[in-house]
């Protein structure tokens, strides 16, 4: 699957649109809720089994994700604002909190 190009559209995520995903230890998506599917514009089939960086926006610096992985691998939670890229090229910005969960991670996103 090819990555979309940013279109310049900014999608607003409403406060009640709380969404989550769980991943394995390598960041491969195992579960997600329907809000994540709706906002990301990816289908269930595209998301489940894909690396979580499928939604990575090219304007996000790699250092942000290095800081996240360094933190969560120690068992600590990580929280940051993240610009994501939907399948249709729209940008959406969320406050992401990532915490260790079993052998993987849970990420909850809000605005």
List where the protein language model places each region.
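Sensory/regulatory domains in signal-transduction proteins
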Residues: 2-111
């Amino acid at each position: 699957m090819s990555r979309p190009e940013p279109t310049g559209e900014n999608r607003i995520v409403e406060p009640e649109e709380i969404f989550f995903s769980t991943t394995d230890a390598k960041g491969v998506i195992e579960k997600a809720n329907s809000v994540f599917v709706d906002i990301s514009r990816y289908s269930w089939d595209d998301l489940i089994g894909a690396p979580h960086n499928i939604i990575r926006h090219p304007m996000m610096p790699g250092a942000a994700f290095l800081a996240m992985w360094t933190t969560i691998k120690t068992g600590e939670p990580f929280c940051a604002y993240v610009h994501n890229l939907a399948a249709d090229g729209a940008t959406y910005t969320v406050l992401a909190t990532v915490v260790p969960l079993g052998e993987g991670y849970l990420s909850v996103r809000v605005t």
